[in-house]
Amino acid sequence: MAIDVFYDDDADLSIIQGRKVAIIGYGSQGHAHAQNLRESGVEVVIGLREGSKSRAKAEEAGFTVKTNAEAAEWADVIMLLAPDTSQAKIFAEDIEPNLNDGDALFFGHGLNIHFKLIEPADNIIIGMVAPKGPGHLVRRQFVDGKGVPCLIAVEQDPKNNGRDLALSYAAAIGGARAGVIPTTFEAETVTDLFGEQAVLCGGTEELIKTGFEVLVEAGYEPEMAYFECLHEMKLIVDLMFEGGIANMNYSVSDTAEFGGYLSGPRVIDADTKKRMKDILTDIQDGTFTKRLVANVEGGNKELEELRASYNDHQIEKTGAKLRDLMSWVKVDARAETA
């Protein structure tokens, strides 16, 4: 099924230019949205909690910084870019009391709306503008006259102008230079969580760790296992990123390609696919979100325990030692966060 893609010619930039936008949060996405909007002629303020360490950065960049509540009261478009686990509290305490008829509440990710952790009144536009890239890339591409593709969605549209507003916002941060793709809160939320859990974070992490363990337990040096199972992952992913899986197979040796075809399905088999479907079900029916909320309400105890156990793995100690030999790794990391 073909998807619609919208570009600058499809967007009316004057719509968002006629609004007052509050960016709640000044992290990776927040700083990029705010600066790109401002340079597109949009009036922007930053909303931060009292004592936020990001305040100095926002003020240094020339923004007016208000409390979350003050920013929400001032604005008629509020983009909530605080962490997912903080959003419901910020909404209840600071945003909801300051919403007026026709205001728009935008998100960069759909979790809190789709799973009804946040439920604005019926007279509020609920929308999403989600660049498919980290904030530093959104900013850098904008400065270079380009853009990062964006997803947009509208969950609630009392005045039938939400989609035009979301498209205008996406254009103002550079998204329509590359392409803006309409979706739904449900599709964005479920696919994003599934990708993180089954493939990008959870799946990849366990694959790397298990491969490392198999080699070390077979008597091979941890350093060799690290190089082969983790370090070279970037080389392979970069090839897939640039041209797809076929490009990766074309670029590696015939030995690697042939071995991959034979052994890949032995690692990721029908049972793995079934368990991935179980993960998808847990996401769709809210099981994961309930556990996420319980973790937050419990003071992040489960998260901290899991983090500590993973950070103590031998692969972390081996990697720290080997990365000290790689001067280019630290240089690349600094460039990505600049």
Curated annotation (Swiss-Prot):
Keywords: Amino-acid biosynthesis, Branched-chain amino acid biosynthesis, Magnesium, Metal-binding, NADP, Oxidoreductase. GO terms for cellular component: cytosol. GO terms for molecular function: ketol-acid reductoisomerase activity; magnesium ion binding; NADP binding. Its EC number is 1.1.1.86. Transmembrane segments: none annotated. It comes from the Bacteria. Binds 2 magnesium ions per subunit. Its cofactor is Mg(2+). GO terms for biological process: isoleucine biosynthetic process; L-valine biosynthetic process. Residues 184-329 form the KARI C-terminal knotted domain. Involved in the biosynthesis of branched-chain amino acids (BCAA). Catalyzes an alkyl-migration followed by a ketol-acid reduction of (S)-2-acetolactate (S2AL) to yield (R)-2,3-dihydroxy-isovalerate. In the isomerase reaction, S2AL is rearranged via a Mg-dependent methyl migration to produce 3-hydroxy-3-methyl-2-ketobutyrate (HMKB). In the reductase reaction, this 2-ketoacid undergoes a metal-dependent reduction by NADPH to yield (R)-2,3-dihydroxy-isovalerate. Belongs to the ketol-acid reductoisomerase family. This is Ketol-acid reductoisomerase (NADP(+)). The gene is ilvC.
